[in-house]
From Swiss-Prot:
Record keywords: ATP-binding, Kinase, Magnesium, Metal-binding, Nucleotide-binding, Thiamine biosynthesis, Transferase
Family statement: Belongs to the Thz kinase family.
Residues noted as binding substrate in the record, renumbered to the chain: 36, 187
GO biological process terms, semicolon-separated: thiamine biosynthetic process; thiamine diphosphate biosynthetic process
Residues at which ATP binds: 112, 160
Protein name per Swiss-Prot or TrEMBL: Hydroxyethylthiazole kinase
Coiled coil regions in record: none
Organism: Clostridium perfringens (strain SM101 / Type A)
Catalytic activity reported: 5-(2-hydroxyethyl)-4-methylthiazole + ATP = 4-methyl-5-(2-phosphooxyethyl)-thiazole + ADP + H(+)
EC class name: transferase
Keyword Signal: no
Molecular function in Gene Ontology: ATP binding; hydroxyethylthiazole kinase activity; magnesium ion binding
Organism superkingdom: Bacteria
EC annotation from Swiss-Prot or TrEMBL: 2.7.1.50
Length: 265
């Protein structure tokens, strides 16, 4: 049977107020339609309409937490792919408890985080206290625990870092695309969360979703590399940011195939 790729999927986002505009823009640039809704009566309709759901816990507030839980449960019930971006889950008990609750009751399709955030979710100790993780080394022991975690919960885990690691417990991949400058732009991790939600929503076939997720991670890194290459003398981080969004809007499969640095395990 021929597999058709969904065009312009609708993505429902419940996200933080720091990067909300950037998430909307990258969603459009990558071929999706963003819609932000948090009112309880409205989101019960919006989530059911959507092709994908993103919940980002960057700025937690009581009403938003309730909205996130309602939408996650709807997505679970309707079979809509969902992503939990576990921003700063290592920082407070509130975040840890909420993330664990939404994973248990909402059963997201994918969990994204940096190494410190993912280590916290799998029960390992992390020394990081902010959005940036300085724990760049992913040990084999931790990698195996992440694989077990993903397999037990039937989800994909994306660990962002110098080398990104993606696994569903059965398949795993490492992605070496990207540039250090991406870590200096507020929200590049959140923007990746939007791309991952789109990646899941492009296909209804679960078998295709893992490779599409890996492609999204690699694509984002390649856009960073291209954005850096475009910089001229005396152009700094803000020019880099706009170059990054620019590259996402014009990148194509030929460029991705030429530049991707992906190792499947």
């Amino acid at each position: 049977m021929e597999v058709l790729k969904r065009e312009n999927p609708l993505i429902h986002m419940i996200t933080n107020y720091v990067t909300v505009n950037d998430l909307a823009q990258v969603t459009i640039n990558y071929g999706g339609l963003p819609l932000m809704a948090t009112h309880h009566d409205e989101l019960k309709v919006i989530t059911k309409m959507a092709n994908g759901l993103l919940v980002n816990i960057g700025t937690l507030e009581p009403y938003q937490m309730e909205s996130s839980m309602i939408s996650m449960k709807i997505a679970k019930e309707k079979g809509i792919p969902s992503v939990l971006d576990s921003v700063c889950v290592q920082v407070s008990k509130l975040r840890r408890d909420f993330a664990k609750k939404i994973i248990l009751e909402g059963e997201p399709s994918l969990i994204k985080g940096n190494l410190a955030e993912i280590k916290t979710l799998i029960g390992e100790t992390s020394n990081s206290i902010g959005i940036d993780s300085f724990e760049d080394s992913l040990s084999e022991n931790t990698k195996n625990k992440i694989k077990e975690y993903a397999k037990e919960r039937n989800l994909i885990v994306v660990v962002s870092g110098v080398v990104d690691f993606i696994t569903n417990g059965e398949e795993s991949a490492s992605v070496k695309n990207g540039t250090y400058k991406m870590s200096k732009i507020t929200g590049t991790g959140c923007m990746l969360g939007a791309l991952l939600t789109l990646a899941l929503s492009f296909y209804d076939h679960k078998d295709l979703r893992f490779k599409e997720v890996v492609k999204a991670v690699s694509t984002w890194g390649i856009c960073g590399e291209l954005a850096e290459e475009r910089l001229r003398e005396k152009e700094g981080l803000m020019t880099f940011k706009y170059n990054l969004l620019d590259e996402l809007s014009i990148i194509n499969d030929e460029i991705i195939k030429e530049r991707e640095k992906v190792i499947y395990e």
